[in-house]
Each structure stands twice: as C-alpha cells, then as structure tokens.
Amino acid sequence: MTYNITPLFSTPIYSQDTNFKFFEKEKEFVNSLRYVDHGSGCMLSKDEYIFKHKNLNRIKIECENHLKVYTKKVLCINENFYITNSWITKKERGQSHTWHMHPNSVFSGVFYMNVEGSDCRLNFRAKPQFSPGVLEYSHSEYNQFNSTKWWISVKSGAVVIFPSHLEHGV
C-alpha cells in the first residue's frame, strides 16, 4: 500500500550558502558602528537602518536579491517587497540570543558575516500543529512533521529568510 504526505500550510524557510565575500572596508565599517548590550552578551547595532549607509550598499543589494528569489520564485508572490529595518547582531562563541519574533514585519532575514567554527545554528520553534497544547507525544525520531523546534546550520556568507512571525533564536 502506498501513501502520500502533503506538507499542507508549511512554513518555507529559505537558506543558501553564498559565495559572497565581504570586503575589508565593509567589515571595518561594521566594527566602527556603536553597539548596545541586548542581554546574554548579545550586542545590537544602535543604528537599526544600517542599509542606508553607502558603505553597505553591496550587502544590501545581495540581501534584496535573495528576498526577491524567496518571494518571487519560492512563494510566487506578485507584489514586491523591500527591506525596512536592518541592523547588526554580534555574539561571541557560547553566547545566545533569546527566542523572539519580529512584529510589524512580513519577512525576516539573516546574512552571516563572520561565523567561527562549524556549530553555529539558527533555531526555530513553533506551536504543535496537531493537538496543540492538549496532548504531548513521545517520538521514535524527530522530523519536520512532528517537531516543534528545528534549526539550520549556518556559516559565513549564509543567508536565511523566513516569515517574521516564526519564533527564532541563536
């Protein structure tokens, strides 16, 4: 007997390891920005509109191109989208960023500039899709159909785009 599984109403997450090489002047500009402590050692750029700076125009264009692929080719949306807020998050090895989502936004994206090591992940979590909050099950293994948490491994040059309502952390 054959069966089919349909990932109905799934949440598509776009990720790509790019060949994008950050110029030294871009890295220097990022390092020259002012940062504020956001807790857990996570530092956020005080400027939440970094793509307005010409020094980062090449990075902005790269991000816009990936957003266009995600919205036009993956989601097949006719409308055009643009990046509003943009900021830098800095963390040292072992530091984390608490679970959060981005209200008043449609899509969120992360472009990784400098990842050290091979164990960096972008974590996601969601409410259970079946029997939400009523029953908890044990699983013989976890997969994309039964998990409430999932992650994507990332490295320098990786781009990840996802719906802004999706809770995420590092």
Mark where each language-model region is.
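Catalytic core of non-heme Fe(II) oxygenases with the double-stranded beta-helix
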Residues: K91-I161
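Residues at beta-strand starts and edge strands
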Residues: S10-P12, Y82, S105-F107
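Non-heme Fe(II)/2-oxoglutarate
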Residues: M1-E79, S96
